Curated annotation (Swiss-Prot):
GO biological process, one term: translation
Single GO MF descriptor: structural constituent of ribosome
Keyword terms of this UniProt record: Ribonucleoprotein, Ribosomal protein, RNA-binding, rRNA-binding
Name of the protein described by the UniProt record: Large ribosomal subunit protein uL10
Zinc-finger in keyword set: no
Alphabetized SUPFAM superfamilies for the sequence: Ribosomal protein L10-like
Similarity comment: Belongs to the universal ribosomal protein uL10 family.
GO cellular component: large ribosomal subunit
Pfam families in the cross-refs: Ribosomal_L10
Assembly information from the UniProt record: Part of the ribosomal stalk of the 50S ribosomal subunit. The N-terminus interacts with L11 and the large rRNA to form the base of the stalk. The C-terminus forms an elongated spine to which L12 dimers bind in a sequential fashion forming a multimeric L10(L12)X complex.
Record organism: Syntrophotalea carbinolica (strain DSM 2380 / NBRC 103641 / GraBd1) (Pelobacter carbinolicus)
Length: 172
C-alpha cells in the first residue's frame, strides 16, 4: 500500500473513530468469506461498519480519540466494527455471531472512551435497544392519557346505555 493510500486510510478511520459511539475489535481468523459477508450484512442492518484495517494504521488513527484505549489489543489480525449510534445492536449481533461461529472471537470494545471487557459487551448485548426503550417510554407516557380518554368516553356511553334500558323498559 502506498504512503498516500495509507494516510488516506488513517485520516478516514480517525474521522470515523472520532464520530462513533462504540468500537468493537474482533479476531476473524478462521472465518470463510461467506461468513464474513454474512456478518457484514447483519451489522449493516443495525447501521454498523465492519472493516479490516492494519493494526499500525488503526493505532495511528485512534490517537487522540476515545478508541485509543483499544491500542493494547491491536495484535494479530483484527477487524473493527464501528457503531455511530446505538451500541446495543452491534453488541447483540457480534455476541450472537461469536456464539454460532467458534472461529470468531471478540477481543475488546470501547464505549464512549471506556474500555469494555468481553463480559461487559455480553451484558450490553442483553439490554434492550434504543428503539425498544423509546417504545416502552412512549407506552408509559401514553397509558395515563389513554386511560383518561377511556374514563371520559365511559360517561356518555353509560348514559346512552341507561337511556336505551329506559326505552326498552317502557316498550316492554
Amino acid at each position: 500500500m502506498k504512503k498516500e493510500a495509507k494516510s488516506q486510510v488513517v485520516s478516514e478511520m480517525a474521522q470515523k473513530l472520532a464520530s462513533c459511539q462504540a468500537a468493537f475489535l474482533a479476531d476473524y481468523r478462521g472465518l470463510t468469506v461467506e461468513q464474513v459477508n454474512q456478518l457484514r450484512g447483519e451489522l449493516k442492518k443495525v447501521g454498523v461498519e465492519y472493516r479490516v484495517v492494519k493494526n499500525t494504521l488503526l493505532r495511528l488513527a485512534s490517537k487522540g480519540t476515545d478508541a485509543e484505549c483499544l491500542s493494547e489489543y491491536l495484535q494479530g489480525p483484527n477487524a473493527i466494527a464501528l457503531a455511530e449510534e446505538d451500541p446495543v445492536g452491534p453488541a447483540k449481533v457480534l455476541t450472537q455471531f461469536a456464539k454460532s461461529n467458534k472461529a470468531f472471537e471478540l477481543r475488546a470494545a470501547e464505549l464512549n472512551g471506556k474500555l469494555l471487557s468481553i463480559d461487559e459487551v455480553k451484558a450490553l448485548a442483553e439490554l434492550p435497544s434504543k428503539e425498544e426503550l423509546l417504545g416502552k417510554m412512549l407506552g408509559s407516557i401514553n397509558a395515563p392519557v389513554s386511560n383518561f380518554v377511556g374514563v371520559l368516553a365511559a360517561v356518555p356511553r353509560t348514559f346512552v346505555q341507561v337511556l336505551a334500558a329506559i326505552q326498552q323498559q317502557k316498550e316492554g
